[in-house]
Design a protein with these regions (language model features):
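Class I SAM-dependent methyltransferase SAM/SAH-binding core
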Residues: 81-138
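Conserved alpha-helix/loop element of class I SAM-dependent methyltransferases that forms part
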Residues: 58-78, 95
Length: 247
């Protein structure tokens, strides 16, 4: 399969949900097109990476465990408004949809038209789902519009300025008392072989990921933020972390 890098892709209005209320154009960021075109923005990327076994392999067999740890934070049944930031390869969204109660609704956003199209294709039941092209660092939702927000393996793919804005936006759109759930990379313990195995992998393929080894996710919260609680747990020898912020 041949991958040929293309230029920046602008918003494809035909892929946006008609009820999104999106009023401004969304453009794929330059950093994403330059750094991750092979994984997210190229049309052939989906054909390569949208394989459950592959995303599980990339996470060293931990995909299902980390997925379930994130979703358990939202409860067995979700009756509120939940936001998934970025489409995510694998069956993460399908499992989230299964938790939606009669009054639950899921908004899924992604900046890449290729990912929006893929999400439409892989979700068979979209009755309680809106799939919207939006920039995570400049969301077009009202303040305090969601009961919970989940950000699954996205922060490590962002330069620090975009990451900081995305964390602030996730906080902004969450209702007081609601949860923001982050799952991402973390610095492994010194005794873990992945402390050494992952360095060349991440520095080669994920140039922003080492930030998650060097700083806490809470480091990127906006100054003066008001949070009730911040909880952190690590997994698989410390290579992965779950951070739950209660707004």
């Amino acid at each position: 399969m041949i991958f040929e890098q293309s230029g920046a892709v602008k918003r494809d209005a035909s892929l946006a949900d008609s009820g999104s209320g999106v009023g401004t154009a969304v453009v794929v960021p330059e950093y994403l097109e330059k750094t991750y075109w092979w994984a997210y923005t190229h049309p052939n990327a989906v054909r390569v990476f949208e394989r459950q076994w592959l995303v599980n392999l990339i996470l060293w067999g931990n995909f299902s465990r980390l997925r379930d740890l994130a979703l358990e934070e939202m409860g067995e049944q979700i009756d509120g408004n939940v936001l998934q930031v970025a489409c995510v390869y694998g069956n993460f969204t399908e499992h989230l949809v299964r938790r939606l109660g009669p009054k639950g609704h899921l908004n899924v956003i992604d900046v890449a038209p290729v990912q929006i199209k893929n999400m439409h294709a892989k979700l068979s039941d979209k009755r309680q789902v809106s799939i919207l092209q939006q920039d995570a660092s400049a969301m077009q939702f009202a303040d305090a519009s969601h009961d919970s927000v989940v950000v699954f393996f996205l922060l490590h793919e962002m330069p620090v300025d975009i990451r900081r804005k995305t964390v602030a936006e996730a906080l902004r759109v969450t209702k007081p008392g609601g949860k923001i759930v982050f799952v991402d990379y973390h610095r492994p313990r010194a005794s873990s072989p992945f402390r050494y195995i992952m360095v060349p992998i991440l520095t080669t393929l994920e140039p922003f990921a080492m930030d998650l080894w060097n700083d806490e996710i809470s480091h990127w919260l906006p100054s003066g933020h008001a949070c009730q609680r911040i909880e952190k747990q690590t997994y698989f020898g410390g290579l992965y972390q779950k951070v739950v912020i209660t707004r």
